[in-house]
Amino acid sequence: MRVAYTKARLASRIRQLARSISKDYAGRTLDVVIVLDNGYLFGADLIRSLSVPVICHFVRAEMRDLKLAGHERREIYFSWPPKLRGRDVLLVDAILNTGVTQDFLMKQLEESRPRSIRLAVLFDKPGARKLDIKAEYTGFSSASNYWVGYGLGGRDGLYRNLPYVALSPPSRRKGAATRRRGAARGRVKSWKG
């Protein structure tokens, strides 16, 4: 694997993001909603670097392609944090790729009528975007590479424990085995929290 972002580079950029977020929310308590699984390390390091009071929540959003009666449908399964009405909310995710998941979660969060809601991502891949959504706080903007490490897992969740971000070996990219074997087609698991 080739290292794309070192541990030191990630830490430096996260501290910069935390300073900017802390300045924007000075004097206020911030409800941080971290998207699992990919966002957990970025979220943990980010909230530890913030200088404002933080209430931390977690949401797991899983997007699945379903083939029903010849039609393909996407569903997102998620659990939800409580009582965000009138609060300042920061949604934290590792990667803003197509924007489908983040757009869905932002709309769901807006239904709880927070005072403000913003998005922070470690990586932005604008070339992959399917929806018009932008993060207010972005660590790095990059091409649509497939990465592992620092919370980002390859197929079967491998390499999440790496302290850096690397380009994934082609054989470990999500979906590589599925395309070859067709193993995971038609299986959908709903996560309830």
Segments from the language model and where they lie:
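PRPP-associated nucleotide enzymes
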Residues: M1-G193
